[in-house]
Design a protein with these regions (language model features):
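Phosphate-end processing signature that detects enzymes handling 5′-triphosphorylated RNA
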Residues: 1-197
């Protein structure tokens, strides 16, 4: 299955995180907290990373299934190819570089990724608070990777990327945040931190 992501993000400080967390807790009763672990993979030539795409396996503390995702950079929103993974296929990918049939494998092959040399590069942990508001999802993330902790907010629109930007700019004004057109994704920040070690 593939879907287009219509979202915008902003990096925030720990103090801003605490302020926004308090705001969510005091103003919304339907806030969900989700704990997830992302494992990022690539082939020996770093084919996925070179074109700014992302290949990951995401697991959630609340269930045993995992989600395999290949995220392809797009001009008007990224396209995600997703499929659920059983325990068996998780180990086939991470230990033996064997992929199940499906949309992720098909797209990786189309993009010239060498599936036989796929390896696990790093892990990123996220504590996510999210609340559905009208036609968008408000997300508050704490991210941990390679000894680094950072924070961001994210707006996932049901309408358009433009709508997501309009909404996030309102929150930037409300909380005194700085919007940056060149936001660096958490996966990219984590990869960049590997290069510094």
């Amino acid at each position: 299955m593939s879907e287009k992501e219509l979202e915008e993000r902003v990096m925030i400080s720990k103090d801003q995180f605490l302020e926004i967390e308090k705001y969510l807790q005091e103003n919304f009763h339907n806030v969900k907290t989700i704990f997830q672990k992302n494992r990022y993979l690539d082939d020996k030539n770093m084919t996925v990373k070179k074109v700014h795409n992302v290949l990951r396996i995401r697991s959630f503390r609340s269930c045993k299934m995992r989600e395999l995702t290949y995220k392809v950079k797009g001009q008007d929103g990224d396209i995600e190819y997703n499929q659920m993974l059983s325990h068996y296929w998780f180990y086939q990918i991470t230990r033996d570089s064997r992929f199940p049939e499906g949309c992720v494998k098909e797209q990786l092959l189309k993009d010239g990724v060498d599936l036989s040399s796929i390896k696990l590069l790093m892990e990123l942990y996220t504590r996510r608070m999210e609340v559905k508001i009208d036609n968008y999802l408000f997300v508050l993330d704490t991210n941990l990777y390679n000894g680094i902790c950072d924070y961001n907010i994210e707006i996932e629109s049901d309408v358009s990327k433009k709508h997501a930007k309009e909404i996030i700019l309102k929150y930037c004004e409300k909380f005194g945040l700085t919007y940056d057109e060149n936001y660096i994704s958490k996966s990219r920040r984590a990869f960049n931190s590997l290069n510094k070690n």
